[in-house]
């Protein structure tokens, strides 16, 4: 017998869950990837993609076809799917979808601010923004000279407003301060999203909390790695770490003191989930830390579909689709640049 919560889930969200599971079934198979890596030109790639769920998404693109055009059209297709889910959702799933868009909004804001710093035209930078993170006030981002101005002039009416409470500063937004702002926003965002999922309870919490814990720890590890050799102090580094992961609190304290990659690896070795990831870095495959993180993320998101009656399938599908898109872009770049030796270095999903 289904529990009451599960019965209610099906009444409110069962249609969309069935739909997203159907979408997941249309992800590229291993045989599709075998066919893609054999393509000689981007036009060949386009023809093969037409035989998959991507269909004729490039039909209106005139020659010459570029990797950038393929990437843009794939993003638009994903955005159309996401908008359909979101527009047909009821609360609290609607709020869950809003949380999902916040990470893209943060990336878009940072992209626009860096563009303004480099005196690029707003139109040029907007074209590079992710469609899932678009909002009406975006074009005004370039008028802000400090985090406080950015909040008051642009973000106060957006879903990002609550995450700005720890980021208020009158400091001029130079390149370093913009990067610090990105990490502080992500920290607040992940902690809030984690709390939302945990408070929701049921299977959504059981599936989403481990996924967000991993994302929080991944950010802490990548921030640490990227801070080596920079002017970022150890104290400032620690303030950027999300506190909703498995590394909190002791692991984060040790990471803040790390001097190099080996020191960082020793911290990770204390955690059963992260030791094998660090052990897999390098080796014969030449994998980077980012590669092994992506592989682990794919595994977790595939497993999310083994459970029913939860919101995690929507998050997992978007993440798996994004990895698929990265794979296609990687293969397309190798074909375009005639650099086929690493064409198989994509991350399989199914």
Curated annotation (Swiss-Prot):
Function: Subunit of the V0 complex of vacuolar(H+)-ATPase (V-ATPase), a multisubunit enzyme composed of a peripheral complex (V1) that hydrolyzes ATP and a membrane integral complex (V0) that translocates protons. V-ATPase is responsible for acidifying and maintaining the pH of intracellular compartments and in some cell types, is targeted to the plasma membrane, where it is responsible for acidifying the extracellular environment. May play a role in coupling of proton transport and ATP hydrolysis. Regulator of osteoclast fusion and bone formation.
Biological-process GO terms, alphabetical: vacuolar acidification; vacuolar transport
Annotated GO MF terms: proton-transporting ATPase activity, rotational mechanism
Binding partners and assembly: V-ATPase is a heteromultimeric enzyme made up of two complexes: the ATP-hydrolytic V1 complex and the proton translocation V0 complex. The V1 complex consists of three catalytic AB heterodimers that form a heterohexamer, three peripheral stalks each consisting of EG heterodimers, one central rotor including subunits D and F, and the regulatory subunits C and H. The proton translocation complex V0 consists of the proton transport subunit a, a ring of proteolipid subunits c9c'', rotary subunit d, subunits e and f, and the accessory subunits ATP6AP1/Ac45 and ATP6AP2/PRR.
GO CC, one annotated term: apical plasma membrane
Name of this chain's protein: V-type proton ATPase subunit d 2
Summary of the tissues where the protein is detected: Epididymis and vas deferens.
Domain of life: Eukaryota
Family: Belongs to the V-ATPase V0D/AC39 subunit family.
Keywords: Hydrogen ion transport, Ion transport, Transport
One Pfam family here: vATP-synt_AC39
């Amino acid at each position: 017998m289904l529990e009451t919560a599960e019965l209610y889930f099906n009444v409110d969200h069962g249609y969309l869950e069935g739909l997203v599971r159907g979408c997941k079934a249309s992800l590229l198979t291993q045989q599709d990837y075998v066919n893609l890596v054999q393509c000689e030109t981007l036009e060949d790639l386009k023809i093969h993609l037409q035989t998959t769920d991507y269909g004729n998404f490039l039909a209106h693109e005139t020659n010459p076809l570029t990797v950038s055009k393929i990437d843009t059209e794939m993003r638009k297709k994903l955005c159309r799917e996401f908008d359909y889910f979101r527009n047909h959702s009821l609360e609290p799933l609607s709020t869950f979808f809003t949380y999902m868009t916040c990470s893209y909004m943060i990336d878009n804001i940072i992209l626009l601010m860096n563009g303004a710093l480099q005196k690029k035209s707003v139109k040029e930078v907007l074209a590079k923004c992710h469609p899932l993170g678009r909002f009406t006030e975006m074009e005004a981002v370039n008028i802000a000279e400090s985090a406080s101005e950015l909040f008051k002039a642009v973000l106060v009416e957006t879903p990002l407003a609550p995450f700005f409470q720890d980021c208020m500063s009158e400091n001029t937004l130079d390149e370093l301060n913009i990067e610090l702002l990105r990490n502080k926003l992500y920290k607040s965002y992940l902690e809030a999203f984690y709390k939302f999922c945990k408070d929701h309870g049921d299977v959504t919490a059981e599936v989403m909390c481990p996924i967000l814990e991993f994302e929080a720890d991944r950010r802490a590890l990548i921030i640490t790695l990227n801070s080596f050799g920079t002017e970022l102090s150890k104290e400032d580094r620690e303030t950027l770490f999300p506190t909703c992961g498995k590394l909190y609190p002791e692991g984060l304290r040790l990471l803040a003191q790390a001097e190099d990659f080996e020191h960082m690896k020793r911290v990770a070795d204390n955690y059963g989930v992260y030791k094998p990831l660090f052990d897999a870095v390098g080796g014969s495959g030449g994998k980077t830390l980012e590669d092994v993180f992506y592989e682990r993320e794919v595994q977790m998101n595939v497993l999310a579909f083994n459970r029913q009656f939860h919101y995690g399938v929507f998050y997992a599908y978007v993440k798996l689709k994004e990895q698929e898109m990265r794979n296609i872009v990687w293969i397309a770049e190798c074909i375009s640049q005639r650099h086929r030796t690493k064409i198989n270095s994509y991350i399989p999903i199914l």
